[in-house]
Amino acid sequence: KSVKMIITILEKNGYEAFAVGGCIRDTILGRQPQDWDITTSALPQQVKALFNKTLDTGIQHGTVTVMMSRVGYEVTTYRIDGEYNDSRHPDTVEFTSNLIEDLKRRDFTINAMAYNPTVGLVDAFDGIGDLERGVIRCVGNAMERFSEDALRMLRAVRFAAQLGFSIERETQEAIAGLAGNIKKVSAERIQVELVKLLTSPNPGELKVAYRTGLTAVFLPEFDMMMETPQNNPHHCYSVGEHTLKAIEAVPADKVLDRKSTRLNSSHYSRSR
């Protein structure tokens, strides 16, 4: 109701506004969205003028948090991103009045859909088709998307694990080609994605990170495990495969058990 109210207020004042991103993906899949993001043609100061309680959470990038019933909803102006020299944030941001230009900058097609009750679903990059096919695919050029934010490579693997999807060929090839860039990402951001992956319904997808060269950079111990046979007639898997099988044997809803089974985070390391 709060999301609909925010969109309605923006529209009544002459602006476009849509729910966007993961909340749309999850709603289509019948999953409960963790949060709701709104994108709008209104500039940050225009958004602030329409609502009683707002927070400048990322105003330099066009984001204002609107508070409704003590819950925050991020409202971000349509934007075009400049270069990403830190492999995380754009150096410059240009606001635009064009929704499609805003959707172009997003990571994966399944996260680049927008919806409001007036217009309906806006799906310029066949996100619905990729949801139906069970595919993780970058919006536009995969090399460009991963060069903008190297964490997106691990996010692709994490989404595949959470949703039971496969990674589209060109997207996976781009990960393999740019895997070394993951060293530019902080250990904290990587660990968040890694924990989400290992506590997903398909933790074995970590093998995709191994095959594409990602774990060689941020978790070289796992590569050693994958390449170490047990030399035991009772164990047909490598140490790495055996570890993943053990993790998979723990139900996904037993998060604490999963975390105790996985590689201890205190041993988490990265090589540069």
Q: Residues of each region from the PLM?
A:
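Catalytic cores of the polymerase beta-like nucleotidyltransferase superfamily
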Residues: 1-272
